Curated annotation (Swiss-Prot):
Stretch forming the signal peptide: none
Subunit structure: Component of the eukaryotic translation initiation factor 3 (eIF-3) complex.
Residue span of region Sufficient for interaction with HCR1 and TIF32: 1-94
Similarity-based family: Belongs to the eIF-3 subunit B family.
Biological classification of the source: Eukaryota, Fungi, Dikarya, Ascomycota, Saccharomycotina
HAMAP family (UniProt xref): eIF3b
Annotated PANTHER family: EUKARYOTIC TRANSLATION INITIATION FACTOR 3 EIF3 -RELATED, EUKARYOTIC TRANSLATION INITIATION FACTOR 3 SUBUNIT B
Subcellular location: Cytoplasm
UniProt record, GO biological process: formation of cytoplasmic translation initiation complex; translational initiation
Function: RNA-binding component of the eukaryotic translation initiation factor 3 (eIF-3) complex, which is involved in protein synthesis of a specialized repertoire of mRNAs and, together with other initiation factors, stimulates binding of mRNA and methionyl-tRNAi to the 40S ribosome. The eIF-3 complex specifically targets and initiates translation of a subset of mRNAs involved in cell proliferation.
Annotated source species: Eremothecium gossypii (strain ATCC 10895 / CBS 109.51 / FGSC 9923 / NRRL Y-1056) (Yeast)
Gene transcribed to yield this protein: PRT1
Keyword hit for Transmembrane: no
Name the UniProt record assigns to this protein: Eukaryotic translation initiation factor 3 subunit B
Residue stretches of each WD repeat: 140-182, 186-224, 226-244, 245-284, 288-328, 332-375, 443-483, 511-557, 566-604, 616-662
GO molecular-function terms, A-Z: identical protein binding; RNA binding; translation initiation factor activity; translation initiation factor binding
């Protein structure tokens, strides 16, 4: 009989110091099944057993969009499916993508799929799992300041930002007067540069933890975008989405974390798309290994309905309104595609009906192969209809230049000779509003280095360079060429309105050789263009040239062609040896050049020029880093309203001159304000007198007409005879 010890309990015996490693290794149960690769699908059609194969085929094709499907089990009971099934994917990432893509998706009119992970079933089956609906806690609404408040400035001033060392300041532009602070200067506002959104609504700053957006009259922080170590950002066309890129892949835990904006499916990704208004991450991408990256990596359509990115042998187009799903459920497979570009505006295609919305147009190009020539292809989205294809030969590179209104597209084709020793450029210019999209070829003997369309116009400027000249850097080899459409004349010799002429032929207005210029920048308002030499610090050849393409005095123009829609005049020539960057203000009246300490330490500061090339303001600032204007949204005025403003420009000019005088001199300001007060007092006195007289039945300046208009006038007719010449002549007399 075994001994019994009533005073000894089993739980009191210490076992923590007992080594049971050998027992754990001996009896360890290996988990051979990875349950995170399985998903459970509810809501599937209940079908006869004979149609299970067809059902599996349909669902396999659907779920293959998330990843490779290894197996699909469809339970059958009493000769019919049970309405749910189990799917095994190749890896856990594919299973998570399937849950995200297809949970709640309508399969047809009567069936909606509900997708959950197999691991979730264990959690749902626990006794402590509550099935009671809990209404989510909605955070209280926080009113924000008007993000476009700077547009309400009474004098219509623009804003600009200066960065000096650790300090950043935002100013109102006051022409040649001292700038006025918008907010107090801030220290360490950003780790590096700051960026405005395309229309100036948001200001973005860089930080170790991610990106922050700022806005409103006081530039308060609006949202945070938690993406560590961001290197570059870009914005969508309508400012709805923000794209961030980090060189470090995302590290995401498997455990749910409300503070983390990323799910497990984003692990290892480096590219993120955010909703700017809410701060929510809507899409992430992994980058292809060992591939040269081109920024921006994500490009947007004019209305943000589509975004696309380039991949190996394909272009992936996503529909933003459908949770960033692939257009048509698949990528556009294009063998060896090199680059693509969206039209910056919607295009009214000639083949469409008048009431049809503007079309989204994309262009891409593929290089030459053994059996095919180089091609540039215009397509329409979302139907992927090919609008026009041009075939090219002996091509080295292709680049696209859109006119800002998407009326014209220049396909710049860099071609090589048969010996491949020399490269020259052809420009294929397409008119996108004309039927059948005609292309006009402009041939250049040299290689084009820069190309720039005039805003809202059909003229352009290029900088080219011959590859057959001396390589001595001290010799100016660049050529600046100005192009404009040829004037068209009807049979009677009358010039046809350039707005009515669809088929255009571009001609060289003037070519200016022997230049060091390497940058072209047009005024946003058009007409004026600046050509500059930037980058060679300390060089005497760093010059800035201003040109007017519509100079009114034809005696001073420098055209070599007269039958073109341009009258070219060189306005100013300026030397600024330390300039590193430049930017026009949104109005197109001022052009700022600056010297950044991020690039060199010589004469850091900025200079602002007007259209005539005169300096409006300049400052030398030690440790000066950056200068940039705040952009403006597109004008809301119609063409007729703009014409009305131009018609009354003299009246507006007088008003603006008065405002400028008031800002320039305090004494003048006081005098103008006094005169305004006197005028107001006189107007009030006159109204009071008018009211008093009206009560007596009289009106101001009552008078009795004493005579009619005809009675006041008397017609006097005077006849004068003047003898011009008098002579005497003897006339023979004939009798009858």
């Amino acid at each position: 009989m075994a001994a019994v010890f009533d005073d000894i309990r089993l739980e009191d015996i210490p076992v923590d110091d007992v080594d049971m490693q050998d027992l754990e290794e001996t009896y360890a149960v290996e988990r051979s099944i990875e349950f995170d690769r399985y998903v459970v699908v509810d809501g599937a059609p209940v079908a006869p057993e004979a149609k299970v194969g067809a059902l599996q085929k349909v669902l396999t094709k659907l779920f293959s969009q998330a990843g490779s499907v290894v197996d699909m089990d469809v339970p059958v009971e009493e000769g019919r499916t049970k309405g749910h099934l189990f799917i095994e994917f190749e890896d856990a990432g594919a299973a998570r993508r399937a849950i995200k893509m297809f949970n709640g998706k309508k399969l047809d009119v009567k069936h909606r799929l509900w997708v959950n992970g197999l691991d979730d079933m264990e959690r749902y089956g626990r006794p402590d799992f509550s099935t009671e609906y809990r209404e989510p806690v909605v955070p209280e609404f926080e009113a924000t300041e008007y993000p476009r408040s700077w547009l309400q400035d009474e004098t219509g001033r623009d804003q600009f930002v200066l960065q000096k060392g650790e300090m950043t300041a935002v100013f109102w532009n006051r022409n040649n007067l001292q700038p006025e602070n918008v907010v107090e200067p801030r220290r360490n506002w950003s780790n590096s540069i700051l960026n405005f959104s395309p229309h100036g609504t948001y200001l973005f700053s860089f930080h170790d933890q991610g990106i922050a957006s700022w806005g409103g009259p006081q530039f308060k922080r609006l949202r945070r975008f938690a993406h560590p170590d961001v290197k570059a950002i870009s914005m969508s066309s309508t400012e709805k989405y923000l794209v961030t890129f980090s060189s470090e892949p995302l590290e995401v835990s498997d455990e749910p974390n409300e503070a983390c904006p990323f799910g497990p499916e984003s692990r290892g990704h480096q590219l993120c798309i955010w909703d700017v208004a809410t701060g929510v991450c809507v899409k992430t991408f992994a980058l292809p290994p060992q591939q040269q990256l081109q920024w921006p990596m994500v490009k947007w359509s004019f209305d943000d309905k589509f975004c696309a990115r380039l991949g190996p042998g394909a272009i992936a187009v996503y529909e933003t309104e459908k949770n960033f799903q692939l257009l048509g459920g698949k990528v556009m497979k294009i063998e060896d595609v090199q680059d693509f570009s969206f039209a910056p505006k919607g295009i009214k295609l000639a083949s469409n009906r008048p009431n049809d919305p503007p079309s989204t147009v994309m262009v891409y190009w593929t290089p030459e192969s053994n059996n095919q020539s180089c091609k540039a292809v215009l397509i329409e989205l979302p139907n992927r209809r090919v609008l026009r294809t041009i075939n090219l030969v002996q091509v080295t590179d292709v680049s696209f230049h859109w006119q800002n209104q998407a009326e014209f597209l220049c396909v710049q084709v860099d071609r090589h000779t048969k010996s491949r020793k020399t490269i020259f450029t052809n420009m294929e210019i397409c008119s996108l509003t004309a039927r059948e999209f005609p292309f006009e070829k402009v041939e250049i003997k040299d290689r084009c280095m820069r190309f720039a369309w005039e805003p809202n116009s059909d003229r352009f400027v290029i900088i080219s360079r011959s590859e057959n000249v001396n390589d001595n850097p001290a010799i100016a080899k660049n050529v600046v060429s100005f192009y404009a459409p040829e004037k068209k004349v009807d049979k009677k010799g009358v010039i046809i309105d350039k707005e009515l002429s669809i088929f255009k032929k571009w001609k060289l207005v003037r070519a200016i050789d022997g230049k060091f210029s390497n940058e072209i920048t047009w005024s946003p308002a058009g007409r004026f263009v600046c050509v500059a030499a930037i980058g060679k610090i300390g060089s005497r050849n760093e010059n800035i040239d201003f040109y007017d393409m519509d100079y009114p005095n034809t005696e001073k123009i420098i055209n070599t062609a007269t039958d073109v829609n341009a009258t070219l005049r060189d306005v100013a020539h300026i030397n600024y040896a330390s300039a590193t960057d430049y930017e026009w203000d949104p109005s197109g009246r001022y052009l700022a050049f600056w010297s950044s300490a991020w690039k060199h330490k010589a004469e850091n500061g900025y200079k602002v020029f007007n259209l005539a090339g005169a300096i409006v303001r300049e400052e030398l600032i030690t440790d000066f880093n950056n200068f940039f204007w705040r952009p403006r949204p597109d004008s809301l005025l119609s063409n007729s309203e703009k014409k009305k403003v131009r018609k009354n420009l003299k009246e507006w000019s007088a008003h603006f001159e008065e405002q400028d005088a008031m800002e320039a001199d305090s004494a003048t300001r006081e005098l103008i304000l006094k005169r305004r007060n006197w005028l107001d007092e006189w107007s009030k006195y006159r109204e009071a007198c008018k009211q008093t007289l009206s009560e007596s039945g009289l009106s101001i300046c009552d008078c009795v007409e004493l005579s009619t208009k005809d009675e006041d006038c008397e017609l006097v007719e005077e006849i004068r005879e003047t003898v011009v010449e008098e002579s005497t002549e003897e006339v023979p007399f004939f009798e009858e």
